[in-house]
Amino acid sequence: ALGQGHTAAKVPEVLFDWIDSGNRLTRTDERYSPEAFDRCRRAHLLDGPLAGKTEVDMWGAGQAGKPWLSWLLAKGFTVRHVVEVSPKKIGTKIHDTPVISDTDLPPPDGTPLIIAVGAAGARELIETDLAQKGYTPGKDAWFVC
């Protein structure tokens, strides 16, 4: 669907709620593992926003971001830089990829920005930062966590 111009977004209000028990199939079956969901996300990225691209930017050099960075590099993408807010990581390299500050993120230029940050509350902060820089989630930037 993303490859056909459709977009995905998180809505601000609860649309449906149900009781979640620990014995649900989605909690016990391997088909619903985090790895299975990552495979699904990756397939949709390759068919959608990454189709025909050779370069990509990334946001997130932590536990959630490093596996995505490794995957992108293994798939042959050139990752121009990884955006990070941790002062310890800014100015270093991870897998030979420069780590830059969020304040150094350039405006959108057609290069997909993949965002892999799992910290609670980070998504909202990143969305605000992206909007100020002219990015539109689902058009210029994609959250994968």
What are these regions (language model features)?
Residues 7-8, 23-55:
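C-terminal, non-catalytic tails of nucleotide-sugar-dependent glycosyltransferases
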Residues 1-13, 19:
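A short, conserved alpha-helix in the catalytic core of glycosyltransferases
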Residues 9, 55-59, 114:
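Conserved beta-strand elements of the Class I
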Residues 87-145:
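Phosphate-bearing ligand-interacting subdomains
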